[in-house]
Amino acid sequence: MAIEQTAITRATFDEVILPIYAPAEFIPVKGQGSRIWDQQGKEYVDFAGGIAVTALGHCHPALVNALKTQGETLWHISNVFTNEPALRLGRKLIEATFAERVVFMNSGTEANETAFKLARHYACVRHSPFKTKIIAFHNAFHGRSLFTVSVGGQPKYSDGFGPKPADIIHVPFNDLHAVKAVMDDHTCAVVVEPIQGEGGVTAATPEFLQGLRELCDQHQALLVFDEVQCGMGRTGDLFAYRYYGVTPDILTSAKALGGGFPISAMLTTAEIASAFHPGSHGSTYGGNPLACAVAGAAFDIINTPEVLEGIQAKRQRFVDHLQKIDQQYDVFSDIRGMGLLIGAELKPHYKGRARDFLYAGAEVGVMVLNAGPDVMRLAPSLVVEDADIDEGMQRFAHAVAKVVGA
């Protein structure tokens, strides 16, 4: 079907794109720092961060420079060969974490798919072909492939696609007794987000994660931390596992890892990695020089005291604004999360209306997120300026007033 080449508008989306998204009515065309401009030149303060991706804001000079420099050198070579940016980034991640081996992919879904395949394969070759059970949690989110969406504990995303991968059990989050009730020697892995992002910005308790570590050790199962959303500085530590003092066997990272450029990583120990061999898994684009060069530049900035030590003060500034809004409009029952992954749960009177607040925010020039129908979510740049926080939250207060007065 021929499509007339006219001006690009929001209606163009409905004409040409698969209907799996419901994007905003405006189209962003430019970003700088924590500001976005649309086709009409309207300015927005961005507290959505591309869903916790643009950790250094839009068009950070160091990332732009890394992209331009690498773009003039080598873009893609495939994994028939290796490349210097991937090896440099791999070394940085290993030196900064528990891990001894890393593999790069293109998205959080792919990193988690790799992790789940490795966990099952490791159990098969080291223990038993019947050691296949994966324990995961209600309201979790681990990606959109058939395997990862099945491990995620949200039927609204996984139902309707035919048979799912078998031997996946879901139990309530933060409920160690529920895990104990289903844990046995057939379990190959427990998969958990230290902070459930899509599931409502709910943080695990230290006792829960420590208990999972002990149960995995008792049953020779692997503990897998999905830090796709909460990792790379988001909590104030480089990775959330360091805050909790609980070391996983496998960790996945994406989103902020590339600062806006698609890349993900799965990290593990040398012993666990040795279960794989050439051909066990792979990716055409994973670890390409362009992505790894940008991610390396992002890592060098995020993994600094200047960035990490400033996150709690920025969080408190957001929380102070949210509390002030709640005092004025009586809309939030809980303000939670960690670092700059912030959730504000709506009171019963406003249950199910999170997207109303999101849309109202866009109308007044502030971009926010929801985490389910009842929770507002903020995932701004880790280097967002105080002036941007203040102005953006003032705009959000106007958005709340619009919804409350509606």
UniProtKB/Swiss-Prot annotation:
Known cofactor(s): pyridoxal 5'-phosphate
Role summary: Involved in both the arginine and lysine biosynthetic pathways.
Cited PANTHER family: ACETYLORNITHINE_SUCCINYLDIAMINOPIMELATE AMINOTRANSFERASE, AMINOTRANSFERASE CLASS III
Residues reported to bind pyridoxal 5'-phosphate: 108-109, 141, 226-229, 284
Pfam families: Aminotran_3
UniProt-listed InterPro entries: Ac/SucOrn_transaminase_bac (IPR017652), AcOrn/SuccOrn_fam (IPR004636), Aminotrans_3 (IPR005814), Aminotrans_3_PPA_site (IPR049704), Class-III_PLP-dep_AT (IPR050103), PyrdxlP-dep_Trfase (IPR015424), PyrdxlP-dep_Trfase_major (IPR015421), PyrdxlP-dep_Trfase_small (IPR015422)
Note: The reaction catalyzed by ACOAT is highly reversible. This enzyme may also transaminate ornithine.
Protein name: Acetylornithine/succinyldiaminopimelate aminotransferase
Coiled-coil blocks: none
N6-(pyridoxal phosphate)lysine modification, residue list: 255
Assembly description: Homodimer.
Amino-acid biosynthesis found in the keyword field: yes
Pathway of action: Amino-acid biosynthesis; L-arginine biosynthesis; N(2)-acetyl-L-ornithine from L-glutamate: step 4/4; Amino-acid biosynthesis; L-lysine biosynthesis via DAP pathway; LL-2,6-diaminopimelate from (S)-tetrahydrodipicolinate (succinylase route): step 2/3
